[in-house]
Regions:
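Polytopic transmembrane helical bundles with strong interfacial aromatic enrichment
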Residues: 1-257
């Protein structure tokens, strides 16, 4: 496929241009096998008619592939000085990095949870939003309790994720924070609002394709955005405050990660 050809080319260029060994390993032994397995799982999804295991696994591999590509691109831009230089560590950098990393993990969990909602046909377990069939608290039916539980969990995690992203945005406003982290936190805040509204539209429109597809797309955008915030905040936390780091990207020691 085109994607596989591009990844093989990327792995070749990473080796030919003398990129760090970590980048070479990620491209050759990470991305290429992941995409191969993704293609195989895609066939399995069709063969067993969208079973929840294959659907969720297919999405998880796609998100991991997207995550590795995001890391390779962000790292290349940083090393080549084609983006805003990572500033030296500031007060609270390590804590900010932990918040960003935890938020990115929660985005991944929420995406997989959403695929389970789809796989178990739980998208309309409750047909109103923001209420649960007109009630403030969900009322569970013993026959459909598992599907209803998935639906409720997906909603609650969405609210928790929104709160974490807002907390990241507030924390990123502190002096000395990497401006890229500030911008990505602001973008993630906007994306999570759009994502929740699309989730509501899915229920109001009874899972029409014109809202379901954008819901998945915005989720992938949110995943990528949070990964950039997590990578950049980690690189800043790992940076050493020396005269060289202030000299710019051409002279600053690069973080090992």
């Amino acid at each position: 496929s085109v994607v596989m050809a591009l990844l093989v080319w990327l792995a070749y260029e990473a080796r030919r241009s003398g990129q760090p060994r970590k980048v070479q390993r990620v491209t050759l032994w990470g991305l290429v096998p992941l995409v191969s397995l993704q293609a195989l799982l895609g066939a399995v999804v069709v063969w067993i008619k969208l079973h929840w295991v294959s659907v969720s696994s297919h999405l998880a591999l796609a998100l991991l592939t997207l995550g590795l590509v995001t890391w390779v691109v962000a790292d290349a831009l940083r090393r080549e000085g084609l983006t805003t230089p990572v500033p030296a560590a500031a007060d609270g950098s390590a804590r900010l990095a932990r918040v960003a990393r935890a938020t990115a993990v929660l985005v991944f969990v929420q995406m997989i949870l959403g695929s389970l909602v789809t796989g178990f046909d739980a998208g309309m377990a409750y047909s109103t939003f923001p209420s649960f069939n007109g009630d403030v608290l969900p009322d569970f039916d013993a026959t459909y309790a598992f599907r209803q539980g998935l639906h409720v969990a997906h909603r609650l995690v969405a609210y928790g994720l929104a709160a974490m992203i807002v907390a990241l945005l507030v924390r990123s406003r502190r002096s000395g924070t990497d401006p890229v982290v500030r911008r990505t936190a602001a973008l993630a805040t906007a994306l999570v609002v759009v994502q929740i509204m699309l989730g509501a539209a899915n229920i109001w429109g009874r899972l029409q394709a014109d809202t379901v597809v954008p819901h998945m797309l915005v989720g992938a955008m949110l995943w990528t955005t949070m990964l950039v915030a997590a990578f950049r905040s980690r690189w800043q936390a790992d940076a050493v405050t020396t005269p060289q780091t202030a000299a710019g990207p051409d002279h600053a020691p690069l973080a090992a990660r």
